[in-house]
Regions:
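N-terminal secretory signal peptides that target proteins for export/translocation
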Residues: 1-34
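Bacterial N-terminal signal peptides
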Residues: 33, 37-51
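Boundary at the C-terminal end of the N-terminal hydrophobic targeting segment
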Residues: 51-59
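N- or domain-start disorder-to-order transition segments that initiate the globular core
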Residues: 58-62, 66-82
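M16 family metallopeptidases and their MPP-like homologs
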Residues: 77, 82-98, 104-106, 122-166, ...
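Active-site SXXK
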Residues: 103-117
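Non-catalytic, conformational "gating/processing" segments within enzyme and secreted inhibitor domains
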Residues: 174, 181, 231-266
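An aromatic/glycine/proline-enriched structural segment found at the starts
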Residues: 210, 218, 247-315, 418
């Protein structure tokens, strides 16, 4: 049996002087599309780790940014250790921006972007990248859709030309749409409908967000996917795929001026689009009652209890709030030395595993949660009570200075390791910029982390 318990709000749960809720963790539902399948990827608590690498020896950022006349925002992150580059195009559009009744259209269009243009024949985009010695991929989230290639430095002009081409010149046939619809429906059956954990997660999200579109699955509801057609896809494409709704990030063995010149040549001729006047979404009302979602399924294996909370994201939090949450959850729920693991797994032996997560990257809000997998002969009710005990201990006692310092030190050590990847740098900057942050916000993050106190947590 899988048992999910969701509390969207704890009215009496106030761990910070400036907070209304204790906000806690994830980096969970991130839709990564390899065009062979819709998969869920967790990127963990190190989502902001790469910010440290953006600081030079004197603390100066290495990132350069500029904007073309047509509105295309460009970031360049030089990294000359190897003659390779990562190119990413981020569109400020995701599943939460879909028209009512058309769930899944953002992800559907992402698939269809690999079909063809007048320049690139149907199905040849990824093959062309591969023939040039590179790799490519794409993903859709509630807030963003992104496409990327990793290639040798001298192949950057080619892949930039290809990205600019499909930004403006996508061609779709009825056959393209019908074929891809079948692929996505099969993905949903395989990844969601046949997986009790995914079913529970989908239902918990729908219960957590009663009005906001974050409660709608990125892949879409089955009955609405079936109704998507060619005109739906082209309408979404024509409305949102534009240079003034996109961010180009290039990381690797390049210099800012050469990228700017190349981008002006490849993207500069694409006209901007009117009508992109912000992202207006329904607001989530205040929640006053807990909601419990329970799933019983013979395929589920051991009993699992999860608890979700609404939380601020880095884009929506008050100054210092999200940083305090990151460190709190490092202490509370990250790894075998966390409070929840030591209490439930080591001391009480009620769980085979336990932890937590903080989803900090949403444009409008974030999520947080705890989970525990029951040990033998432990009921869902006992496990739920045990999780509540850990949460109550945090509410009453907070964290110690030693715990905070250890969490901060481990985080910074992780930053150094994580920042070694140019693709992670490109992904991090692109995602944060596409969800309302600035380069200055990103560069200031390490110092804000250092300023977090025990009282903040």
């Amino acid at each position: 049996m899988l048992r999910g318990r969701l509390r969207a709000r704890f009215p009496d749960f106030n761990l910070r002087p400036y907070g209304k809720i204790m906000w806690i963790l994830d980096q969970l539902v991130y839709a990564l599309d390899m065009r062979a399948g819709f998969v869920l990827a967790s990127f963990g608590l190190a989502s902001l780790a790469v910010a440290v690498a953006a600081e030079g020896a004197q603390g100066a950022p290495r990132v350069s940014e500029f904007t073309l006349k047509n509105g295309l925002h460009i970031l360049v992150i030089p990294d000359h250790r190897a003659p390779v580059v990562t190119q990413m195009v981020w569109y400020k559009i995701g599943a939460a921006d879909e028209p009512p009744g058309s769930s899944g259209i953002a992800h559907f269009l992402e698939h269809l972007m690999f079909k063809g243009t007048d320049l690139i024949p149907n199905g040849e985009f990824s093959k062309t990248v591969a023939r040039n010695g590179g790799e490519d991929n794409a993903f859709t989230n509630h807030d963003v859709t992104a496409y990327f290639q990793r290639v040798a430095k001298d192949r950057l002009p080619k892949v930039m030309e290809m990205e600019a081409d499909r930004m403006a010149n996508l061609r779709l046939s009825e056959e393209d749409v019908a074929t891809e619809r079948k692929v996505i429906l099969e993905e949903r059956r395989t990844r969601v409908d046949n997986d009790p954990g995914s079913i529970l997660q989908e239902q918990m999200m729908a219960a957590l967000y009663t009005n906001h579109p974050y409660g709608i699955p990125i892949i879409g509801w089955d009955h609405e996917i079936r109704a998507l057609d060619r005109e739906d896809a082209l309408s979404f494409y024509r409305r949102f795929y534009a240079p003034n709704n996109a961010i180009l990030v290039v990381a690797g063995d390049v210099e800012p001026e050469e990228v700017k010149t190349l981008a002006e040549d490849k993207f500069g001729k694409i006209p901007p689009k009117d009508g992109l006047n912000g992202r207006i979404r329904p607001e989530e009302p205040a929640h006053s009652t807990p909601v419990k979602v329970t799933l019983e399924d013979a395929r589920a294996g051991r009993t699992t209890v999860q608890r979700y909370y609404l939380a601020p994201s880095y884009a929506s939090a008050e100054p210092g709030e999200a940083e305090a949450v990151d460190l709190l959850m490092r202490v509370a729920a990250a790894g075998s030395i966390s409070k929840i693991y030591k209490k439930l797994v080591v001391e009480d032996q009620k769980a085979a595993n336990a932890g937590g997560w903080y989803s900090d990257s949403g444009l409008d809000s974030g999520r947080l949660g705890f989970y525990a997998i029951a040990a033998k002969n432990v009921s869902a009710e006992d496990l739920e009570e045990a999780i509540d005990g850990v949460v109550e201990d945090l509410r009453q006692n907070g964290v110690t200075q030693e715990e905070l310092d250890r969490a901060r030190a481990s985080y910074i050590a992780e930053f150094v390791y994580t920042s070694d990847s140019q693709s992670r740098m490109a992904r991090h900057y692109g995602w944060r910029l596409a969800t309302g942050m600035t380069v200055a916000d990103i560069e200031a993050w390490p110092d804000r982390l250092r300023r977090v106190t025990v009282d903040d947590v």
